[in-house]
């Protein structure tokens, strides 16, 4: 069997946490690290090699340039322009990050990259769309982590309230990985029952779904303000998406996909349910949204498109 190879571009907090998660879960044979800080990335390589030595089997961990990528199956982009400096805005951050991405992706394509791009860099949806445009790859081969972490948080919050396993919950968040995301309660269920019908049966009361949705949205910001970054949750997100791609699980995850008419939208990438296969996005699932949800989706799409204009 052909060795499965993942390249992580950006060995900061997120990239390093993702690399460690790959080592622990051991379903790829080769892990490749890329970073401008050569001393740091070499230190990471050695540290990860030590961690891998405790695991069964063999994993090759190496350092390369991003352009040395012709044999890579999945390239995970976690690069960032760094924290905002005094006087900078989020738009400044977007433009700086966009410039970094614009310097990397064309070099990778010249290097013969034919695999799948997975974007975790924020703002995820905007950078995902930029990578797709720069790469010239089919849209199926470019996706972002999108709102899968937010969706997983939503399920965790519901599970904690109801004292059940999160895996028993079918609930989704759609839209931007940011302020305009929203839960799709019309398509959410627990053991086949609407969320609050199940809650009434088990707890004798309805849950505050609005508050739960807001908490799922805001948790990432809270973590950032409390510890200065988010890393473990998004690392788990990256690894899970890659696992489903490699296994060809054909499971639907809410990831950032380039739309071509789905949900009435084009010209952007946004978080929607998508079936994953070994070629990337096999199918985008078009849910029939109610009027309020469609309005929320259109608003979220408008927010993303406005930011795309700035790059």
Curated annotation (Swiss-Prot):
It is found in: Cytoplasm. HAMAP family: Lactate_dehydrog. It comes from Listeria innocua serovar 6a (strain ATCC BAA-680 / CLIP 11262). This is L-lactate dehydrogenase 2. The keyword Ribosomal protein does not apply. NAD(+) binds at residues 14, 35, 40, 103, 120-122, 145. Pathway: Fermentation; pyruvate fermentation to lactate; (S)-lactate from pyruvate: step 1/1. Its EC number is 1.1.1.27. GO terms for cellular component: cytoplasm. The active site is at 177 (proton acceptor). Keywords: Cytoplasm, NAD, Oxidoreductase. GO terms for molecular function: L-lactate dehydrogenase activity. It catalyses: (S)-lactate + NAD(+) = pyruvate + NADH + H(+). Catalyzes the conversion of lactate to pyruvate.
């Amino acid at each position: 069997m052909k060795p499965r190879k993942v390249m992580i571009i950006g060995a900061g907090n997120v990239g390093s946490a993702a690399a460690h998660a790959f080592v622990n879960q051991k379903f790829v044979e080769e892990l490749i690290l890329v970073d401008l800080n050569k001393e740091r990335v070499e230190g990471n390589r050695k540290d990860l090699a030590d961690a891998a030595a405790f695991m069964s089997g063999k994993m090759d961990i190496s350092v390369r340039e991003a352009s040395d990528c012709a044999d890579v199956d999945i390239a995970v982009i976690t690069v960032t322009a760094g924290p905002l400096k005094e006087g900078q805005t989020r738009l400044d951050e977007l433009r700086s990050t966009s410039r970094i991405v614009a310097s990397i992706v064309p070099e990778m394509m010249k290097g013969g990259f034919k695999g799948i791009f997975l974007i975790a860099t924020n703002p995820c949806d905007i950078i995902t769309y930029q990578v797709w445009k720069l790469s010239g790859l089919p849209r199926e081969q470019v996706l972002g982590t999108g709102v899968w972490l937010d969706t997983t948080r939503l399920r965790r919050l519901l599970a904690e309230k109801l004292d059940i396993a999160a895996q028993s919950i079918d609930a989704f968040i759609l839209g931007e990985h940011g302020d305009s995301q929203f839960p799709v309660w019309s398509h959410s269920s627990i053991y086949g029952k609407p969320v609050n019908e199940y809650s009434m049966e088990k707890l004798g009361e309805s849950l505050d779904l609005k508050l739960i949705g807001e908490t799922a949205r805001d948790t990432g910001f809270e973590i950032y303000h409390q510890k200065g970054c988010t890393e473990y949750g998004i690392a788990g997100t990256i690894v899970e998406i890659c696992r489903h791609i490699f296994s060809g699980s054909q499971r639907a995850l809410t990831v950032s996909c380039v739309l071509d008419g789905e949900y009435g939208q084009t010209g952007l990438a946004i978080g929607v349910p998508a079936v994953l296969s070994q070629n990337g996005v096999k199918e985008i699932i078009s849910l029939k949204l109610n009027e309020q949800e469609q309005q929320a989706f259109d608003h979220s799409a408008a927010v993303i498109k406005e930011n795309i204009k700035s790059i």
